[in-house]
């Protein structure tokens, strides 16, 4: 039975596409509400809105304007506030992305309501919605009830699954103007840094290295394994502080919260700040010479050993398996057509 009449879900976009957590949030919203209204804001986001409609939203409000081509906290937050006034939702879900974590508290303040952060689970009891949120780096979980409406919540990426067998909703285009005096800061110029770009939050395979890798030269093995598995490289804060990889690779509380299908932790002890960022991974493999390392408490498979001896063997064996699969795969001529 639905606990809410209407839940609004703000679906962020990146390079014209809805981000993963945006689509994931539709699932808990549909379980709780009679109607799920998604909101897409930006410039040239009409196609993204259609994709959201196909992912399970009953209605998608598309605010497509060149005024919102570049993300602006004041403008985007005010657009959401105006739509909240129109739609009167009982709750607003926002993805726990860098921008989402900025928007949610601003919207909550403007609406004079409460905000639950980094939500891992949502349930309904006795007509109330309860948000489960981590504290102290994930070592403690607390249940949060918000007595005011609309309830605002940021949901962690990977904590929820996308809607299964969704029905397609409708897309409604709306023009929402924001007064100039609302915008406190404007982007006058954008300069893109010429550097590597990775998307840890969307990656299905992540191979991460910690200080246990020993040196920048040794860290190259992490990169080799990631490439072999078609994944991306992650790292702990100490490995980044030592200059082995750039900060863009940081996984954990002060980096990116990730939820890959496979996470391989190499030479990582398992500090709370790091573990809290990988808890939603589908399968965790840990390699560490210390059998008492905390990382083994969350790993599905633990390998106790010298990472510099284990990784070369893993890489070699995976290469053999891939070569074998390639060799045994039938050529087009070998395939029969019935």
Predicted regions and their residues:
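N-terminal glycine-rich FAD/FM-binding segment characteristic of electron-transfer flavoproteins
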Residues: 1-326
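Conserved small/polar residues in nucleotide/adenosyl-binding loops
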Residues: 327-332
């Amino acid at each position: 039975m639905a606990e809410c009449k209407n839940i609004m879900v703000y679906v962020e976009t990146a390079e014209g596409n809805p981000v993963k957590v945006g689509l994931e949030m539709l699932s808990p919203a549909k379980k709780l509400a009679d109607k799920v209204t998604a909101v897409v804001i930006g410039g040239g986001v009409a196609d993204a809105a259609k994709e959201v409609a196909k992912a399970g939203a009953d209605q998608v409000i598309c605010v497509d304007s060149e005024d919102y081509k570049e993300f602006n906290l004041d403008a985007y937050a005010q657009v959401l506030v105006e739509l909240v006034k129109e739609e009167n939702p009982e709750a607003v879900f926002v993805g726990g992305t860098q921008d989402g974590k900025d928007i949610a508290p601003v919207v909550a303040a403007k609406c004079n309501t409460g905000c639950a952060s980094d939500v891992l689970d949502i349930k309904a009891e006795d007509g109330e919605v309860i948000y489960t949120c981590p504290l102290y780096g994930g070592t403690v979980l607390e249940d949060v009830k918000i007595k005011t409406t609309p309830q605002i919540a940021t949901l962690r990426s990977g904590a929820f699954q996308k809607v299964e067998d969704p029905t397609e909703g409708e897309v409604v285009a709306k023009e929402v103007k924001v007064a100039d005096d609302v915008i406190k800061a404007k982007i006058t110029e954008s300069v893109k840094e010429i550097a590597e770009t990775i998307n840890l939050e969307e990656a299905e395979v992540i191979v991460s290295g910690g200080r246990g890798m020993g040196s920048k030269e040794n860290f190259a093995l992490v990169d080799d394994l990631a490439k072999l598995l078609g994944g991306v490289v992650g790292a702990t804060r100490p490995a980044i502080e030592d200059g082995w990889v750039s900060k863009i690779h940081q996984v954990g509380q002060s980096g990116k919260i990730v939820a890959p299908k496979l996470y391989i932790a190499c030479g990582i002890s398992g500090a709370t700040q790091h573990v809290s960022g990988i808890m939603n991974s589908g399968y965790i493999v840990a390699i560490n010479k210390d059998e008492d390392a905390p990382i083994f408490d969350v790993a599905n498979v633990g390998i106790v050993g010298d990472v510099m001896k284990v990784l070369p063997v893993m890489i070699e064996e995976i290469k053999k398996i891939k070569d074998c699969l390639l060799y045994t795969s039938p050529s087009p001529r070998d395939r029969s057509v019935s």
